[in-house]
Swiss-Prot record:
<dbReference type="GO" id="GO:0005615">
    <property type="term" value="C:extracellular space"/>
</dbReference>
<keyword id="KW-0325">Glycoprotein</keyword>
<dbReference type="InterPro" id="IPR000117">
    <property type="entry name" value="Casein_kappa"/>
</dbReference>
<dbReference type="Pfam" id="PF00997">
    <property type="entry name" value="Casein_kappa"/>
</dbReference>
<keyword id="KW-0964">Secreted</keyword>
<feature type="glycosylation site" description="O-linked (GalNAc...) serine; alternate">
    <location>
        <position position="182"/>
    </location>
</feature>
<dbReference type="GO" id="GO:0007595">
    <property type="term" value="P:lactation"/>
</dbReference>
<feature type="site" description="Cleavage; by chymosin/rennin">
    <location>
        <begin position="126"/>
        <end position="127"/>
    </location>
</feature>
<protein>
    <recommendedName>
        <fullName>Kappa-casein</fullName>
    </recommendedName>
</protein>
<comment type="function">
    <text>Kappa-casein stabilizes micelle formation, preventing casein precipitation in milk.</text>
</comment>
<feature type="glycosylation site" description="O-linked (GalNAc...) threonine">
    <location>
        <position position="154"/>
    </location>
</feature>
<feature type="modified residue" description="Phosphoserine">
    <location>
        <position position="148"/>
    </location>
</feature>
<keyword id="KW-0732">Signal</keyword>
<feature type="signal peptide">
    <location>
        <begin position="1"/>
        <end position="21"/>
    </location>
</feature>
<comment type="similarity">
    <text>Belongs to the kappa-casein family.</text>
</comment>
<feature type="glycosylation site" description="O-linked (GalNAc...) threonine">
    <location>
        <position position="175"/>
    </location>
</feature>
<feature type="glycosylation site" description="O-linked (GalNAc...) serine">
    <location>
        <position position="153"/>
    </location>
</feature>
Amino acid sequence: MMKSFFLVVTILALTLPFLDAQERNQEQPICCEKDERFFNDRIAKYIPIQYVLSRYPSYGLNYYQQRPVALINNQFLPYPYYAKPVAVRSPAQTLQWQVLPNTVPAKSCQDQPTTMARHPHPHLSFMAIPPKKDQDKTEIPTINTVASAEPASTPTTEAIVNTEAIVNTEAIVNTVDNPEASSEIIASVPETNTAQVTSTEV
């Protein structure tokens, strides 16, 4: 009998701490729920919206805008692009989208559209093209030192009048009184000629 009594006491001594721990764990959520309910009930009397938001998180405030996702088939943009709705914009501001066949395989958990939208590639004038290595070395042209001593010439056309004829005609006017001298001067006077001469002066 004494052996059985010691056996029961040792079993109870070993199991009592575990039973006590289980009872404490069960009591804690109940106390917290009572405190939360009491606290939320007090708030709900004054601010019912906050009470609903705390009870149902699906009605919580959404700080992010809901935008439609337009997947772009571009090797440089592998992530989804959030496009603004086109209906809000004026016709002048709408983007020109190219509809291309879907080349990305559809995942089993997501349904993808049959077509994908993509921005048109910018024109080459907007892209910066790096210079080639050959263009970095500028060649210095060889200059002829003999030709550089003379200034660059531009051809000009001038009309030259024979000045001897003009001088001789003045002599004719002066010698009208003397007929003998006038005949000699008239015989020696050539006709006035004009000629075009091309000069290379600057």
